[in-house]
Amino acid sequence: MAPKKKGTKKESKKDAVATGDIEGASVEELNQKIGTLEKEKNKEEEYRNYMQLERDKINAFWEITKKDLEDRRAELRNKDREMEEMEERHQVEIKVYKQKVKHLLYEHQNNITTLKSDGELALKLQQDEYRKREGDLGKDKRNLKLELKEQELAHQDIIRQLKLEHAKEITKLRQEFEQQAKDLQSKYEKKMKMLRDDMELRRKQEIHEIEERKNTHINELMKKHERAFAEIKNYYNDITHNNLDLIKTLKEDVAEMKRREAANEKLMYEIAQDNKKLSEPLSRALKEVELLRQQLANYDKDKLSLAQTKARLLNAERQIKNLEWENEVLSQRFSKVQTERDELYGKFEASIYDVQQKTGLKSALLEKKVEALGEALEMKEAQLAEVLTAANLDPGTLAAINQRLEEVLDNKNQIIKALQYDVAKVSKAHNDLIRVYEAKLTEFGIPVDELGFRPLVTNTSTGPAGLVVGA
């Protein structure tokens, strides 16, 4: 690189100044200047060498960077060519995949049509099979219902017999327990009497011992009181003698006090005269003191009222916090009670509906059974009358047969009455349940019309719970 022109101008100026200074300087000064100039020259040479090295380094770095840049540009051109080739290959692959997708869609459509036809055929076969199975299940269901009705009747007979046996066992156990209770009562009454006698004897002994102890204590107290009375009597006798001596000395003191009183009255008159002179400033000072006392009292009152107000404020804040906490607790309890009420109401509706269905179904079954038994009885009576008229039996045999038939009829009538009683009992329970349900709805403030259906009320009596009266 070429040297800069500014440096030459500065050097020419320095040389001109130096020549001007040399003309008017001595030898020593010139030697000193020569030394300084040599030092500056050495520094400048070092600086020039350093700058030359830096310039060489920069040129070397620039050459290396230029070479790297050309290499990177060549790599970039190669990458661009590779990208173009890859793009062309990618387009070709996309076309191939599109063609494959078309073939797959066509095959998939064919598979869907075949599967749809197979599925429709299988569905039709399954529907036929399910219809057949549904018919078989309907028959089985009807047979099971008939068996269930028969089992219910048999269970009711068994339950009736078990209730009778249970009642007998209960009466027997009650009698046994009553006898045991009587025995235990008599036994413990004897024990109580013996204990009462023992306690009475022990009480009398303890009372006698207590009376003896109290009598000895009373005698000791009387002796102590007598000794104390004698001591007090002697004490007061001594006091009276001492008081007489004291009265004499006091009389002498009174005379001396009278003399002093006269002297003091004279002195008081003089002091009163002096006090008249000092009364006016004293009254002013007393007024100021009274005013200050009033201010102090007002300050104390204000301080006390402030403390009381702070205490009331703290108490009110505590009460507000307690009330807020109670309000939060009550609101949570109210929401909980509301949810419980809704749950109970839902359960109550479900139970009412289930009981209504069960009672309705049971009453309908019992009524149908009673009707069927009545029809069967009428048919049996008609058949029996035909058989008897066709048989032409003798009167004795006919009487025995009639008696036997009457017994059978009586048994059947008893069964019919029991069934009618069960029907009436179930109907009454159903009606009572409906009334309780309506009362609960009224209690919760829910109109009965919002129920959504009207409960079926049967025609039975409205007697007490558990009592069934024939309608």
Swiss-Prot record:
UniProt subcellular location: Cytoplasm, Cytoskeleton; Cytoplasm, Cytoskeleton, Flagellum axoneme; Cytoplasm, Cytoskeleton, Flagellum basal body
Residue runs in coiled coils: 23-239, 282-425
Listed GO CC annotations: 9+2 motile cilium; axoneme; microtubule
Keywords carried by this UniProt record: Cell projection, Cilium, Coiled coil, Cytoplasm, Cytoskeleton, Flagellum, Microtubule
InterPro entries: GAS8, GAS8_dom
Family: Belongs to the DRC4 family.
Function: Component of the nexin-dynein regulatory complex (N-DRC), a key regulator of ciliary/flagellar motility which maintains the alignment and integrity of the distal axoneme and regulates microtubule sliding in motile axonemes. Plays an important role in the assembly of the N-DRC linker.
Name this protein carries in UniProt: Dynein regulatory complex subunit 4
Organism: Chlamydomonas reinhardtii
Source species taxonomy: Eukaryota, Viridiplantae, Chlorophyta, core chlorophytes, Chlorophyceae
Gene symbol of the encoding locus: DRC4
